[in-house]
Amino acid sequence: MLLKELSSLASPLSQPQVEKLKQLTAELNAVQLAWVSGYLAATANAPGNLAQLAPVSDAQAAQTVTILYGSQTGNGRGIAKALAEKAKAQGYSVNLASMGEYNVRQLKQETLLLLVVSTHGEGEAPDDAIELHKFLASKRAPQLSNLHYSVLALGDSSYEFFCQTGKDFDARLSALGAKALLPLVECDVDYEAAAGQWHADVLTAVKPLIQTTANVVALNDTSSALAASESEFTKQNPYSAEVLVSQKITGRGSDRDVRHVEIDLGESGLCYEVGDALGVWFSNNETLVDEILAGLGLAADTKVTVGNESISLKQALLEKKELTQLYPGLVKAWAELSASPELLALSGDKEQVRQFILHHQFADLVANYQLKADANLDANKLVELLRPLTPRLYSIASSQSEVDTEVHLTVALVEDEHQGQARFGGASHFLASAEEGAEVKVYVEPNKHFRLPEDPQTPVIMIGPGTGVAPFRAFMQERVAQGAEGDSWLFFGNPHFEQDFLYQTEWQQYLKNGDLTRIDVAFSRDQAHKIYVQHRIKEQGQTLWQWLQNGAHLYICGDAERMAKDVHQALLAIAVEFGGLSSEAAEEYFETLRSHKRYQKDVY
């Protein structure tokens, strides 16, 4: 078989391994290829490797539990790793892998498959899961009558397509003849309890199907290697860092408050790569908590139980409970507690609930929808009603090659006004209000799907309006440290040039030094007709298409709801106009770029 024809479907290699092999061999001459061929043949025929290549018996295969995860953040991976550890402790052989590293040709050999998968954007599969998701939906997918499976779906009920990817996997596996060990488990953002219960239930369901032995060795289990590379500080055990700077970087006349935040990681040993995110735990605003307590007529010092702790109600609302983000279940529960005709009517319409959630907080429910006389909502019932506080993720705006033990963020203060009452985002207000020396609990959330090219000579195109420019500041710091000679192109947009040009002097310095090849900006409200980044992209379509033909990697960061979609449509239009592609071929072209890691998005 010619190497150019090689694919993961025609070999025992995964698609990422195929791409690495193609990249390596493309750089070798005939003599070098011959030497590598001999080396690989000798390695493969070594006694130890021959033993590893021996076929697995049916009995051995039947005793292996394959656990696959697909998640845009680390939540799915964490759940899968914890399940793998519990399964190994019970004597099961475990194959733990990311869906992105899994060879789909192996699927028809599986007998026990446990999936943990999140949903990204509007019902889309996360990057890790795309290839497996597509394979199962294709005509190439095999019948799976020998397979038992279970799916844990992660999602956010405030979005329309809640847990859609998990639903897709469950439906497709069933259609292919696989047998469900358990009904599909759908988890909201407060997934910990449901995931823990699934661990227990699925291992109980697996037990009658396989034999265990105390001496079983886990096969292809990468969880130990993963754990070794991770810091001791995690989402569950964050590092108490110090805020060094929280500086407004929009002008006095701007209607947006955007902060440049610098945080000292000190002696934590926390490391990050450009493209990663920082998880930030925060406390709710005390004024907001006092307003809620007064509105409900509850005493701040009333003792409540949260988990295994007995704390005051006020402390629970400050530190443990989500107050600034509503979710459908809470709106529906409050409709029943208040018996409000408006809320009751609204709660039956998913789209109306979604719109309501976007513009209201829990304090608005308390203020505007009074509880009915027999609601009987005491302090403990209140904390049970509210879901746990969750950290917020911010794209990191710095490279450790330049800032060492610091980490920088670009934070837009989320603020709104409802019936004359100011409302702020929980984490953004916490960071915007933080004074020098304040403590903030943080952890690094890796994002391997938003990485610079391995070769610093590769051109990059960066599209980041608003705070979406944050990771590209990190990209530029890293490329300067690398001495990268590849061209770089930034598209940036915001309302006004004078008020909202984030990091303007830094971009100008990069241009002057030749580190940034070009920048195109769109300031939407500086002229009568609004101009956005997608318009600039279309204007530069011929040049941008040429960059892509020359191997450029394309990155988008920022708003998923509108910007990323509009930019994608602009890119498709360029492929049609300047590449001569049909609409279908243009979609396929960018899908190919994505699968080759040349089209990456960090959208939210």
UniProtKB/Swiss-Prot annotation:
FAD-binding FR-type domain span: 236-453
Q: Enzyme class, one word?
A: oxidoreductase
Q: In which pathway does it act?
A: Sulfur metabolism; hydrogen sulfide biosynthesis; hydrogen sulfide from sulfite (NADPH route): step 1/1
The cofactor named in the record is: FAD; FMN
Cite the EC number. 1.8.1.2
| Superkingdom | Bacteria
Annotated FAD binding lies at 324, 358, 392-395, 410-412, 425-428, 604
**Residues annotated for NADP(+) binding in this entry:** 524-525, 530-534, 566
Q: Which Pfam families match?
A: FAD_binding_1, Flavodoxin_1, NAD_binding_1
Q: According to its record, what are the GO cellular component terms? A: cytosol
Q: Where does FMN bind?
A: 71-76, 118-121, 154-163
Molecular function terms in GO for this entry?
flavin adenine dinucleotide binding; FMN binding; sulfite reductase (NADPH) activity
What does the UniProt keyword field contain? Amino-acid biosynthesis, Cysteine biosynthesis, Electron transport, FAD, Flavoprotein, FMN, NADP, Oxidoreductase, Transport
Q: How is the cofactor bound?
A: Binds 1 FAD per subunit.
GO aspect biological process, one term:
hydrogen sulfide biosynthetic process
InterPro entries xref list: CysJ, CysJ-like_FAD-binding, CysJ_Proteobact, FAD-bd_FR_type, Flavdoxin-like, Flavodoxin/NO_synth, Flavoprot_Pyr_Nucl_cyt_Rdtase, Flavoprotein-like_sf
On subunit structure and binding partners, the annotation says: Alpha(8)-beta(8). The alpha component is a flavoprotein, the beta component is a hemoprotein.
Question: Which family does the record claim for this protein?
Answer: Belongs to the NADPH-dependent sulphite reductase flavoprotein subunit CysJ family. In the N-terminal section; belongs to the flavodoxin family.
What role does this protein play?
A: Component of the sulfite reductase complex that catalyzes the 6-electron reduction of sulfite to sulfide. This is one of several activities required for the biosynthesis of L-cysteine from sulfate. The flavoprotein component catalyzes the electron flow from NADPH -> FAD -> FMN to the hemoprotein component.
Record-given protein name: Sulfite reductase [NADPH] flavoprotein alpha-component
Q: Which organism is it from?
A: Shewanella sp. (strain MR-7)
